[in-house]
Amino acid sequence: MEKFEREIKESKFSELLNKHFAASAIPKGIHCLSLRLTDEYSSNAHARKQLPSPELLPLLSDNSYHHFVLSTDNILAASVVVTSTVQSSLIPEKIVFHIITDKKTYAGMHSWFALNPIPAIIEVKGLHQFDWLTRENVPVLEAVENHKGIRDYYHGNHIVGSNLSETTPHKFASKLQARSPRYISLLNHIRIYLPEMFPNLNKAVFLDDDIVVQRDLSPLWDIDLKGKVNGAVETCKGEDTWVMSKRFRNYFNFSHPLIAKNLDPNECAWAYGMNIFDLRAWRKKNIRDIYHFWLKENLKSNLTMWKLGTLPPALIAFKGYVHPIDPSWHMLGLGYQDKTDIEAVKKAAVIHYNGDSKPWSDIGFEHLRPVWTKYVDYSNDFIRNCHIMES
């Protein structure tokens, strides 16, 4: 019996490890889409047309419009975020989307939105087009990229250092979740520079690429943040262990003296992924410097303060500057658990597939995928030719 139990446990660990690698990989169809659109950019003048057209350029900094920022290298995911936002809007012509991507994806991303116009204003920018965003100006970026401990942690052997005989599958799954390579991507950290990236904007809504918008979001601009910087849904009021019952103790190592001295383990956490930012209020605070300071301290302490991505330093940097918004604005967890209540999903303004089981991957939950796929245009030639099939 002990032998069988050990084999079952080892099999579960193997399953979790395979799932982790599946979640980290780029699906073949999405990779194909990026390559074909990049090729189109070089051969088709229509794919290179200016976005937005010259007469609309002043609207990119017009504060009477609703500005959304999306940072991603996933073209298909970006198209779903933009399409769902526009289709759910009562006034799509008042929407401005600022899409930020990396250098390798820029041409393909630009091609997609140039060839598939929508009734909103679209801007596509590559990180390489922000002159001030260099490793010299932001030294912590170079440190994050080149730190050996970080490279080993996110790209090394995920079994070494894990005592499988003394851990549970649940704990092992949590550790794997914390080791996703996307957590050290500059595209993931870029939101901390929003005031510098958009110096003329007063407010902006930041959206992750694994969300779907189901309701008009224009009322977000009417929410009084009461002088705070970040309007976000709190994630400490629910009962499920994966998503909505998170406090600072879930993210930080309180045996570290610097953490124990500065933070309260019972303080409520909040969600990244759909945030309304008051950029005017933000510019008066030193949020970015605090973020950088704690990133550096965690590097110095060999990642012993926290492991999981960009949320922990943001929890510290925005401490005292977060205004809770109604939970119906942002429902999380669709990439974690397959028991998600479909009726609750239908009522949420924004649903978030945070977690490993993304709707565009093979390990996405079947009953939650149609809410995402209904915003994919399967008649599009590029999507058909890359065999991105409707499930």
Give the residues covered by each predicted segment:
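Glycosyltransferase catalytic domains, chiefly GT-A lineage
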Residues: M1-S391
